[in-house]
Amino acid sequence: MPITFQCPHCGSQTQVDDRYAGQSGACRSCGATITIPGGPVGAPAYPQRSSSSAAPIVIILIAVVVGGLLIVGILAALLLPAVQAAREAARRSMCVNNAKQIGLALQEYADVYKMFPPAYTVDAAGKRLHSWRVLILPFLENKALFDQIHLDEPWDSENNIQFAGMMPSVFACPSNAAAPGSTTTDYAVVEGPGSIFDGDKPCPLGAIRDGLSNTLLVVEASGANLPWMEPRDLDFTQMQCVVGGAGGNEISSHHPGTATVGFADGSARTLPSGTPPAVVRSLITRNGGEAIPANY
């Protein structure tokens, strides 16, 4: 590309090919030494982005990230209670299923022996030996464990204490955080005169005149701290019959506001904490003739 050049000495203009840019020679008009302006052409210069123009973009990016984190946190806070409630509902359903399995095992025992098992067995001197929970092991698919237990010795004898840590999982409520590996059960019967489980006396099916669907068979007793093999349950004579009541001798639960119970007909459901004590007492008795409200 030609370069227009004016001699600084004589003022004459001329067209010079750009390949001579930066070279010196004699002016065609006056003969004076001249230097053609220009030189190697470099890469075109691009305008540099100033730090002041980049700052708003950085601020916007930070705002977007922080805003996104805030939204995630808010969503998590909103969803967490719903997730926890769903999990608790699932555990409550599993607890009801446990009570149903225990109730069905008791029914199978009754089908074989024509009576429900006693609350506990005793030796010749009347000393308590084993719980009903041990007696129904064969009906809970745990006959191998049952066959190893020395039924003629106390539950905590030298030969038997080794089995205390082998509690079947059906005896633990799913909401009990200490359940895995636990030796204590969350399920009990109400033991005492008037109930299905009156000491060491088995209860014939015909003795339940209030109706199987109106008589409690097994209840949740998470506050009782009961070793599963120990021949001990809730004492009917000492109960206040309050669902969720304080102390270790009441129907109690890991589930807020309810407790799981199983009936003699094999059904199971939850009782609300506000159930009147008179209703609870009526459900415990097997031959009291009480009127049970329809909603219970």
Describe every region a protein language model picked out.
Residues 1, 21, 76, 254-258:
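A short, compositionally biased
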Residues 28-31, 84, 103, 137:
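Short, surface-exposed helix/turn micro-motifs that flank interaction/cofactor sites
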Residues 91-296:
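Surface-exposed loop/linker segments characteristic of extracytoplasmic
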Residues 8, 28, 81, 97-100, ...:
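Surface-exposed alpha-helical interface segments used for non-catalytic interactions
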